[in-house]
């Protein structure tokens, strides 16, 4: 409520002559809320988007109808189209901020604008997602009590612009994030594998901070013992069985004691079959691990850390970009007796602070979240 939105009407002219959009009339329940008599030329064999700005003032479900009068070849035609809107009271919503100020993967980096499904799912639970386009937006959200969680996907090193100007977190941003978490805010960090750092421009420039190190700067600022590996998770066995790339993984080994897995369905007889089991999509992802008090990788998880998702028994770490990180030395963690596995998602709850969620891949992208 009381926030401007943009409704876009798309026209397509499949004829061999131009047309003129003479007017557009927007109405709700028979009441006109706006007209546009600008007059637009719709060229032959082309499309045209016409935006209309509207500010709803009440929380309700309603339908907006647009009526367009179009002239072509001395003939006038009238077309109508409707869209349903569910407007929520802005003051009663919980806010989640999504960082877009660091060429973040799936947000403003590679595969940009790919968190819409997550936003739709959140809206169903009266949660509003807000894209934070600048560092100033991110810092402001950290001190805004409306925001209960922040999501930071990996700052791209794949996008050409990101390779030219690789983004990292400023000291002010790190402090703001630490203060946000200390005040009870949830911080969600996602990594991406070093598949997407295996480029000459990166390998020849040691000054470029890798994605894992960049995200780990945040985890260090939060006081977390979790880290994202500078590696890639591969699985020769499961990828062959599924007929996909070695880094296109679907995991189904969960820690059922973690509240995030509540309600997840796993059929022990069909753990890899999506018809029976709800699988965790992990595309092009990295593993995660814990460090001890000295900052050294350890296979012993502190009591503050709770695993969420493990790799398969056949999943392994590989150092794709050959920078000496990742690979066989990456810590594994006990899933069951005589069954140690890579960890790909975990939470950490430090005393007096908000929850920290760490994943080796962006589990909230449109490719992972299926929602209407």
Across the structure, where does each feature detected by a protein language model lie?
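Short proline/glycine- and polar residue-rich coil/turn motifs
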Residues: 40-46
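Structural beta-strand segments of beta-rich domains
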Residues: 3-7
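Short acidic/proline- and small/hydrophobic-mixed sequence motifs that coincide with surface turns
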Residues: 16-21
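Short, solvent-exposed loop/linker segments at beta-strand-coil boundaries, enriched for Pro/Gly
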Residues: 27-34
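Short, hydrophobic beta-strand segments
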Residues: 50-58
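Short, surface-exposed patches at the edges or C-terminal ends of soluble domains, predominantly
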Residues: 57-61, 67-372
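Asparagine-centered strand-capping/turn motif at beta-strand->loop junctions
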Residues: 11-15
